[in-house]
């Protein structure tokens, strides 16, 4: 899980979702998991 100030899709299977008020990227590739920090 990468924590970044700005999250972007890294491939076509990445999906941007909002969970508990945080923007996250979920993907079939575990390296592409991201969460938006403060």
Swiss-Prot record:
UniProt-listed GO biological process terms: translation
Disulfide bonds: none
Protein keywords: Ribonucleoprotein, Ribosomal protein
GO CC aspect terms: cytoplasm; ribonucleoprotein complex; ribosome
Pfam families: Ribosomal_L36
Classification via InterPro entries: Ribosomal_bL36, Ribosomal_bL36_sp
Coiled-coil regions, chain positions: none
Domain of life: Bacteria
GO molecular function: structural constituent of ribosome
Family indicated by similarity: Belongs to the bacterial ribosomal protein bL36 family.
Protein name: Large ribosomal subunit protein bL36
Name of the coding gene: rpmJ
């Amino acid at each position: 899980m990468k924590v970044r100030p700005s999250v972007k899709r890294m491939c076509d299977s990445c999906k941007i979702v909002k969970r508990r008020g945080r923007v996250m990227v979920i993907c079939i590739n575990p390296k592409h998991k991201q969460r938006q920090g403060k």
